[in-house]
Curated annotation (Swiss-Prot):
The gene is moaA. Its cofactor is [4Fe-4S] cluster. Its EC number is 4.1.99.22. This is GTP 3',8-cyclase. The keyword Plastid does not apply. Belongs to the radical SAM superfamily. MoaA family. It comes from the Bacteria.
Length: 359
């Protein structure tokens, strides 16, 4: 019988918090030293993109992975299956770069949707290619979509994305609605000096389309390393602006303890809408983090802001078996810090920009 050590109670508490039966004979539960159980996986399938948002990647001369350096669909399927079937991962989100620029992306969705035990399969996209792919993605098994939309104005879109195309994004959102996804959320970065004039229009748009809108505090993930804390339009500032425009903004909590967004309801022209505020900078939610990230070249990251990665691609290609891969995954989880530390004096942004990590 296991002795009643502190680690015993941590694992009991973690299992209860995660909503799973406690199984003390299971050595593979991905619980870190702070009791956080990791059941959510972000998989980046490319570091390439068809726009150049300043908060994500450089405008010119971006260095991309060679094709041989990117995980194959079969390698992604192997790791995803291992994490779901043997490590308790329950949801997977496909990211990039822009995932839809990778050829035959729909085939990968179909492969992942067949994994026994996977409860949720979603994607984050810039929406530019959704008109061409939304129906096929839905029929392949993709359940939910997050679409980046920082503005409805073309001039502002070009300022952010350094490419034209907001009309294509809006058309892609319409295509996603037509395809019948279980959930569609719009993600808007909250950037001081830019977003203040966009908030109200985006809220009206989201209510008109009957989708959820989330404002995400601007984070230090830009390739130019130009981020400063003064550039963050805080969640509190967003709520103040929305209250001035719409009146009561009523908090409704989080979808679940590990959800990054605090949700609110408000009314516009007699219709109710739902918004989310993700305070990654001013009110971090690291204590409830349940996420792991897999980069396009097979690096496993235990935090978006981690300074290190566990290289799983090379391990697989050198013949590493599943048990050894799990050991590497467990070690990565075990090294996770308590928090990202953006507010600390010694904080350093990750070496990779957002497009190379995966959104």
């Amino acid at each position: 019988m296991e002795t009643l050590t502190a680690s015993f109670f941590v694992r009991i508490a973690s299992s209860i918090r995660a909503g799973y039966p406690t199984n003390m004979t299971d050595p593979i539960a991905l619980v870190d030293r702070f009791g956080r159980r990791h059941d959510s996986l972000r998989i980046s399938i490319t570091d390439r993109c068809n726009i150049r948002c300043f908060y994500c990647m450089p405008e010119h001369d971006a260095e991309f992975l060679p094709r041989s350096g990117v995980l194959t669909f079969e390698e992604i399927e192997r790791l995803a299956g291992l994490l779901v079937k043997r490590c308790g991962v329950r949801d997977i989100r496909i990211t990039g770069g822009e995932p839809l620029v990778r050829r035959d992306c729909v085939d990968l969705i179909r492969m992942l949707a067949r994994i026994d035990g996977l409860e949720d399969l979603s994607m984050t996209t810039n929406g530019m290619l959704l008109r061409d792919h939304a129906a096929d993605l839905r029929s392949a098994g993709l359940k939910r979509l997050n679409v980046s939309l920082d503005t409805l104005d073309e001039a502002t879109f070009v300022k952010i994305a350094r490419r034209p195309g907001v009309d294509r994004v809006i058309d892609g959102i319409d295509a996603a609605i037509e395809a019948g996804f279980e959930s569609i959320k719009l993600n808007a970065l909250a950037i001081r000096g830019l977003s203040e004039s966009e908030l109200v229009g985006l809220v009206r748009f989201s209510i008109e389309k009957s989708v959820t809108l989330r404002f995400i505090e601007f984070m230090p993930l830009d390739s130019d390393r130009a981020w400063k804390s003064k550039d963050v339009l805080s969640g509190d500032a967003c709520l103040k602006l929305l209250s001035e425009a719409f009146g009561d903004v009523t908090p409704t909590g989080r979808e679940n303890p590990s959800a990054p967004a605090e949700t609110f309801t408000l009314r516009c022209d007699g219709r109710e809408g739902t918004i989310g505020i993700i305070r990654s900078v001013t009110r971090p939610f690291c204590g409830d983090c349940n996420r792991l990230r897999l980069t396009a070249d097979g690096g496993l990251r235990n935090c978006l802001f981690s300074q290190s990665e566990t290289p799983l691609r090379d391990a697989m290609r050198s013949g590493c078996d599943d048990d050894k891969l799990i050991q590497k995954i467990q070690q990565c989880v075990g090294e996770k810090h308590a928090a990202h530390g953006i507010d600390s004096d010694d904080f350093r942004p990750p070496e990779r920009a957002m497009h190379a990590i995966g959104g």
